[in-house]
UniProtKB/Swiss-Prot annotation:
CDD domains per the UniProt record, alphabetical: GATase1_CPSase
UniProt organism field: Lactiplantibacillus plantarum (strain ATCC BAA-793 / NCIMB 8826 / WCFS1)
Classification via InterPro entries: Anth_synth/Amidotransfase (IPR050472), CarbamoylP_synth_ssu (IPR006274), CarbamoylP_synth_ssu_N (IPR002474), CarbP_synth_ssu_N_sf (IPR036480), Class_I_gatase-like (IPR029062), CPSase_GATase1 (IPR035686), GATASE (IPR017926)
Pathway connected to this protein: Pyrimidine metabolism; UMP biosynthesis via de novo pathway; (S)-dihydroorotate from bicarbonate: step 1/3
Active site: C244 (nucleophile), H329, D331
Domain Glutamine amidotransferase type-1, chain residue ranges per copy: 169-356
Stored PROSITE patterns: GATASE_TYPE_1
One GO term (biological process): L-arginine biosynthetic process
This protein's name: Carbamoyl phosphate synthase pyrimidine-specific small chain
Alphabetical keyword list: ATP-binding, Glutamine amidotransferase, Ligase, Nucleotide-binding, Pyrimidine biosynthesis
Catalytic activity line of the entry: hydrogencarbonate + L-glutamine + 2 ATP + H2O = carbamoyl phosphate + L-glutamate + 2 ADP + phosphate + 2 H(+)
Amino acid sequence: MKRYLVLEDGTIYPGTGFGATTATVGELVFNTGMSGYQESITDQSYNGEILMFTYPLIGNYGINRDDHESIKPTCKGVVVHEVARRASNWRNAQSLDDYLKQNAIPGIMDIDTRAVTKHIRTKGAMKATIVDNVLPDTVDRLKVTELNRAVVAQSSTNNAYPNPATGPNVVVVDFGLKHSILRELAKRQCNLTVLPYNTTASEIMALNPDGVMLTNGPGDPKDVPGALEMIREVEKHVPLFGICLGHQLFALANGADTFKMKFGHRGFNHPVREIATGRIDFTSQNHGYAVDRDSLAQTDLLITHEEINDGTVEGLRHRDYAAFSVQYHPDAAPGPHDADHIFDEFIDLMAANQATQKGSQFNA
């Protein structure tokens, strides 16, 4: 079935449809990973976006039951060069085509995704649509289409739920979390309580947490202003750790600014340097916004990590509080596990804070 990928600037790419047969509109973004398409499609950080893969063959190992990063994918569409006709993997449960149909996500193939990526890198991120027919007003209608900005509310859990264990009590504030974050914390025996994105500081502190995690999520951090007051209050009392969107919200809550990147970081080969040690980790990333480096000068935040290629702020730490964040995904999924030691640093921070509190009680 003939379909078209139409960009906001009027560029049109003809291709062949697969997945759901509906039309769609979203921001077109590209992922440079050579694998991990299942984890990416089910990552809530892609909510509202049309996800394009630069690797030329997608779907060759199918979709399995284990690697979902969320229950329901929310990306608006999938763009590939070629979809594998047959999936070959012992865990394969269904084809990519069937999975997209099942979840009402349209796809388009036979697209030169590397050429489209070069176009996006030059022109910047823009809206796009996948349609069966290009009409005279298709581009004009695309230009005036307002994309949904309430994506965090859509991606977050509506109800609190536990993931019990015997270790430290960690409250996870869900802005669109990946299951791999919960897995990494569970590996370290954290007793988890996952809460909606709009939970207040008083509601969090009523659970007597040993630490608070701010997860990844979709969209512009400035569209979640209610989280900032919660962060400002919580960081005074217990260790706090933010990832991706959580990192950006942590920065905003402490007086820094964020900005929309030209085309973002989406892939899992991004080199990040830890400034204090010079250690370099290859990291998994998925973000279209970043912290403004210059805006940090008048805050109590210190830069701990930076992206080697373009200098993006990749890590922050508070001068006075036991609070820190990273822009990248130390949980990987997909990608390298170079940076999973960051979770151990969170565990150590909680242990040190508990020891300090016990010492204060003893001295009193």
